[in-house]
Amino acid sequence: MKKHNVFLLSLGCSKNTVDSERLMAQAEASGITFTEEADLADTILINTCGFIEDAKEESIAEILAAVEKKTQGIVSGVYVMGCLSELYRTEMREELPEIDGFFGTRELPALLQAIGAQYRDELYDHRSLLTPPHISYLKIAEGCNRSCSFCSIPKIRGRYRSQPMEQLLREAALLQKKGVRELNLIAQDTSIYGRDLYGTPMLRELLVRLSDMEFRWIRLLYAYPLDFPLEVITAMSERKNICNYLDLPLQHCNDRILRSMNRGITKTETVRLLDTIRAANPDIRLRTTMLVGFPGETRAEFDELMQFIETMRFDRLGCFPYCHEEHAPSYALEDTVKAEEKEERRAELMELQETIAKENNQLFEGKELTVLIDQIEGDIAIARTEYDAPEVDNECYLTTGSLRVGTGEFCTAHISESSAYELHGTITAVNG
């Protein structure tokens, strides 16, 4: 039987990336090869994102481009997997008969069979990395039990399912053998890890067990404010290789909007949580995400959010305009804020955050920081501090002088200048 040469395009979030890496490891074990150029492949496989409208449009555009290559005879097979396929399989099957198969988020064995590979249980922990070799993600759970009204993830990914701790430790050990030095923990909701399996949250225990391994940085992403286990913050202080960093998407602060979003938390409770976290670990840096233009959001409610951000002074912040997603519960509400107004509010909020970020970064000037080198361009090393997650946060641009520096190395850097989203300086020592 002919073994396919596959071009895999993985779109969307880091959770999707992990799914693609699992698929690749399974397929390669069956003799499938992968290429980075679509024109050299005989099969195209697209792992889609369907979370917001822009992501859907990108996924559809890539699907149509793949269909065109099939029509031209460049490739013989096109398969679609992931979130968009989970939501719109019936519609896409009718509109795109050229596609050889559609597979949802929980159909890896069937997808492998379609491309001439076999799923093997013993390879579940194995992944072929799509990230730089020194960085990886550990997906500690699937699905989501929250009922945020703006979100379709529970419909796409199903109920919350923690991965067994021993399995995660085996997977982490394999990543360590591959040379991964920074491990980023992800899930739709990392806060309640383990509750479904062990009857109690086990996130701190997992972090400590991972900390006993040889990763230099372990980072926690996608924590949910309700039910967040504060003992995790203590672990950050106690364990040198658990980053003093927390990604805690809040979405909003106004109580009426939080109720309409079904977030399960109030503004007062949110402020208390943030104050408690910072008091327990003064060195922590907080990242959050805000959603503007939610149905019914008034100018006064948006101004309240702006004041909240100015008061809380988040170290890292992303902001998105509300997307009226037909598969989300909030689709039943009237989308009252015009698209132009949503974008104006997003820009206004990010302008405020830029000012805050610039002032926060000035505190690093004159200091020496440990950084991880992600990239080398000439005599400039592009790096991150422990306070910066891959892809979404600040970067450091550092001169190397006479020092020989490679990607994936930890170094000491003297910071001389800063801006809102960058630090500039010089590498003073290579720490290996």
Curated annotation (Swiss-Prot):
Gene3D superfamilies the UniProt entry points to: Methylthiotransferase, N-terminal domain (3.40.50.12160), Nucleic acid-binding proteins (2.40.50.140), tm_1862 like domain (3.80.30.20)
Cofactor(s) essential for the protein: [4Fe-4S] cluster
Domain TRAM: 362-429
Free-text comment on the cofactor: Binds 2 [4Fe-4S] clusters. One cluster is coordinated with 3 cysteines and an exchangeable S-adenosyl-L-methionine.
Domain MTTase N-terminal: start-end pairs: 4-120
Residues that hold [4Fe-4S] cluster 2 according to the record: C144, C148, C151
Keywords attached to this entry: 4Fe-4S, Cytoplasm, Iron, Iron-sulfur, Metal-binding, S-adenosyl-L-methionine, Transferase
Keyword Transferase part of the UniProt annotation: yes
Keyword Metal-binding: yes
Molecular function as annotated in GO: 4 iron, 4 sulfur cluster binding; aspartic acid methylthiotransferase activity; metal ion binding; protein methylthiotransferase activity
Xref: InterPro entries: Elp3/MiaA/NifB-like_rSAM, Methylthiotransferase, Methylthiotransferase_CS, Methylthiotransferase_N, Methylthiotransferase_N_sf, NA-bd_OB-fold, Ribosomal_uS12_MeSTrfase_RimO, rSAM
Domain Radical SAM core span(s) in chain numbering: 130-359
Intracellular or extracellular location(s): Cytoplasm
Enzyme class: transferase
Entry-linked Pfam families: Radical_SAM (PF04055), TRAM_2 (PF18693), UPF0004 (PF00919)
Chief localization: cytoplasm
Annotated binding of [4Fe-4S] cluster 1, by residue: C13, C49, C83
Annotated catalysed reactions: L-aspartate(89)-[ribosomal protein uS12]-hydrogen + (sulfur carrier)-SH + AH2 + 2 S-adenosyl-L-methionine = 3-methylsulfanyl-L-aspartate(89)-[ribosomal protein uS12]-hydrogen + (sulfur carrier)-H + 5'-deoxyadenosine + L-methionine + A + S-adenosyl-L-homocysteine + 2 H(+)
SUPFAM superfamilies attached to this UniProt entry: Radical SAM enzymes (SSF102114)
Single GO biological process annotation from the record: tRNA modification
Main function: Catalyzes the methylthiolation of an aspartic acid residue of ribosomal protein uS12.
Family: Belongs to the methylthiotransferase family. RimO subfamily.
Protein name listed in UniProt: Ribosomal protein uS12 methylthiotransferase RimO
Name of the encoding gene: rimO
